[in-house]
């Protein structure tokens, strides 16, 4: 068995993968191939992605989609409709208007935010189990899976690694960390996962987790920000107001068996 690492930039983030296998290069090459497919399926920033095809057809027609995409939208809708949830996968129009984290980010005026809030109702995402179709009832609606997709993709990669006979692995998908199998670098089998101190530069940790066969997901207001007219705006939007969530929380970490659950709950609970 040999341990190898690969780093690739996809989905607007840095992805690190570390695997232990008899043929680690082939495993990592296939993982990168799959990541490119997942990006084409789940991205809200690629106009040609399968998700964006749904959004382009908003108010016009349903679209039959890949089972993975259908499942993730179904899960996202369920958690978007939960009482007091900060997660709303129909928040796409607001995310694309604020554009926090991109070069063209701006603060929308209050009237525009109110107008966009009217097309962010997750109840108007219609799903057909029988046909595996997704239909957005109102023109202008758009789904954004940014609060779910990285975790879900990390879980898909983990499943692939296990089926391919990988003995142990670490996946760091833009802050979504998944580990399974024994760590090859410590005396005990547990992996050490550092939690970034949001007040200090990279690689300064406020805590170090010891985990195995689990995922650690961190959401924070310090990652992507917009400064305008002397105010700082972070990228985690409150689906009730359309503005960045007002909170004293800077960073929230959830440890879960599945990475997608960690993503769901960091978003649902952020600022509460």
Name the predicted role of every residue range.
Residues 1-272:
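Mature catalytic core of soluble alpha/beta enzymes
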């Amino acid at each position: 068995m040999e341990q190898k690492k690969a780093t690739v930039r996809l989905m607007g983030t840095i992805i690190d993968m570390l695997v232990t296998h008899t043929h680690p290069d082939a495993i990592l090459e296939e993982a990168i191939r799959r990541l490119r497919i997942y990006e084409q399926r789940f991205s809200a920033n690629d106009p040609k992605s399968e998700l964006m095809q749904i959004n382009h057809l908003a108010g016009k027609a349903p679209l039959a989609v890949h089972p993975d995409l259908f499942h993730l939208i179904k899960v996202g809708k369920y958690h978007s409709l939960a009482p007091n949830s900060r997660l709303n996968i129909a928040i796409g129009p607001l995310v694309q208007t604020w554009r926090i984290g991109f070069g063209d980010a701006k603060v929308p005026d209050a009237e525009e935010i109110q107008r966009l809030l009217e097309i962010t109702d997750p109840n108007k995402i219609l799903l057909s189990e029988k046909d595996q179709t997704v239909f957005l009832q109102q023109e202008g609606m758009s789904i954004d899976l940014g609060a779910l997709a990285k975790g879900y993709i990390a879980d898909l990669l983990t499943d692939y690694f296990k089926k391919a006979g990988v003995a142990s692995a670490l996946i760091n998908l833009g802050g979504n960390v998944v580990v399974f199998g024994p760590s090859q670098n410590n005396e005990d089998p547990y992996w050490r996962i550092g939690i970034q101190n949001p007040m200090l530069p990279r690689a300064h940790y406020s805590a170090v987790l010891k985990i195995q066969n689990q995922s650690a997901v961190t959401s924070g207001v310090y990652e992507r920000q917009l400064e305008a007219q002397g105010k700082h705006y972070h990228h985690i939007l409150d689906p009730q107001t359309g503005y960045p969530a007002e909170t004293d929380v800077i960073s929230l970490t959830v440890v879960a068996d599945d990475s997608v659950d960690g993503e769901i709950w960091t978003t649902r609970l952020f600022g509460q």
